[in-house]
From Swiss-Prot:
Residues 1-16 have a biased composition (Pro residues). Residues 44-55 have a biased composition (Basic and acidic residues). The gene is Kdf1. Its main location: cytoplasm. This is Keratinocyte differentiation factor 1. The modification Phosphoserine is found at residue 218. It comes from Mus musculus (Mouse). One of its GO terms (biological process) is skin development. The keyword Hydrolase does not apply.
Length: 397
């Protein structure tokens, strides 16, 4: 029992005097990991609780309370002098490449930058704070995304190669700062230069017609009646018609067929003196070059040789000779049937007389005409041949 006035001894370990306290207990430790975080209290389970659940953790969440200042992730020391040392050494080591490129560390080590340096995340954070955490949309996009879209729009929607050319034409010709950027979906092509019109081209009326092809249309008889245009330039079709007339006047149909065998599509394989003179006259009369005149002449020869109607146009002498003869009816445009100069009334009918050979041949028939007397010749005994005795040819008027 302690005496009255004396302190009651504690049940713990005896206290040491100031002279007996060890010096090792004065060391300070900065390890705070063993301490529970503030705002969390643990309650042990009640022994009378039949469920015997584990310890409960009660967490107080306050919207007005500000989060506790956590130590920076850049280094372990979070004291002011330690952080200065960490910013000088550790951040410089991590962001050395970034400092060499842009002169400022913009990723990962933002604490090592000064307040005046441009930071990429500051604009993003300001935009997020302004829009109160609303997710970005096409109408509301952060600055980095707008810059990326602007760059993509200026370079094209599918790929970003500004020097691509298609058949020598730049696909994206609008790449200068002064020129406006065209629509992305539109095809950015420079208009092709229109070829100059040729001197001997077909008019628009012939181009739209079924016979508008300059090289493959065929002549009809009505084509030869086209009047020559003395004033002005002649069309290509009229030049070919005149060449057709010259060919039919100089050569016969057989000669034109032989000339067609000695030609390719547009060139003579062998030129005679008459062909050379004809080419030179065509070049002078119609103001064509020699190659064009030769090609037109070859096409005219091939066209004439492949026509179904091989009749040449009638000259003045032939027309006067034919004017006296009666005109024959046309049969589908081809003169295949010519009128005969003889009349049926002028023909004389001659009847041949029956000879012995005719009589023998008539007797050889197994079934002769009834009423013909039987032959008494020994070589034809027993045959039932009969003949009427009518002549071989009988005229019915």
């Amino acid at each position: 029992m302690p005496r009255p006035g004396q302190p009651r001894p504690s049940s713990g370990p005896p206290r040491l005097g100031p002279w007996e306290r060890p010096s090792e207990l004065c060391l300070e430790t900065n390890d705070e990991r063993s301490q529970p975080p503030p705002g969390r209290r643990t309650r042990r389970p009640d022994p009378k609780d039949p469920g015997h659940h584990g310890p409960e953790s009660i967490t107080f969440i306050s919207g007005s309370a500000e989060p506790a200042n956590e130590p920076p992730t850049c280094c372990l020391l979070w004291r002011p002098w330690g952080w200065d040392w960490c910013r000088a050494a550790f951040c410089f080591r991590r962001c050395r490449d970034c400092l060499q490129r842009c002169g400022a560390c913009v990723r990962g080590c933002s604490p090592c930058l000064s307040a005046g340096d441009p930071i990429e995340g500051s604009a993003e954070a300001a935009w997020a704070k302004e829009h109160n955490g609303v997710p970005p949309s096409p109408d509301r996009a952060p600055p980095s995304r707008r810059d990326g879209q602007r760059l993509k729009t200026s370079m094209g929607s599918s790929f970003s190669y500004p020097d691509v050319k298609l058949k020598g034409i730049p696909v994206y010709p609008y790449r200068h700062a002064t020129s406006p950027v065209p629509d992305v979906d539109s095809c950015c092509k420079e208009p092709l230069a229109e070829p100059p019109p040729t001197r001997h081209s077909l008019p628009s009326t012939f181009t739209n017609s079924p016979r508008g092809s300059e090289e493959y249309y065929s002549f009809h008889e009505s084509d030869l009646d086209l009047p020559e245009m003395g004033s002005g330039s002649m069309s290509s079709r009229e030049i070919d018609v005149l060449i057709f007339k010259k060919l039919t006047e100089l050569f016969s149909v057989h000669q034109i067929d032989e000339l067609a065998k000695c030609t390719s599509d547009t060139v003579f394989l062998e030129k005679t003196s008459k062909i050379s003179d004809l080419i030179s006259s065509i070049t002078q009369d119609y103001h064509l070059d020699e190659q064009d005149a030769e090609g037109r002449l070859v096409r005219g020869i091939i066209r004439i040789s492949t026509r179904k109607s091989r009749s040449r146009p009638q000259t003045s002498e032939g027309r006067s000779a034919r004017s006296t003869a009666p005109a024959a009816a046309p049969d589908s445009g081809h003169e295949t049937m010519l009128g005969s100069g003889l009349s049926q009334d002028e023909l004389t009918v001659q009847i041949s007389q029956e000879t012995t050979a005719d009589a023998i041949a008539r007797k050889l028939r197994p079934y002769g005409a009834p009423g013909y007397p039987a032959s008494q010749d020994s070589s034809f005994q027993g045959t039932d041949t009969d003949s009427s005795g009518a002549p071989l040819l009988q005229v019915y008027c």
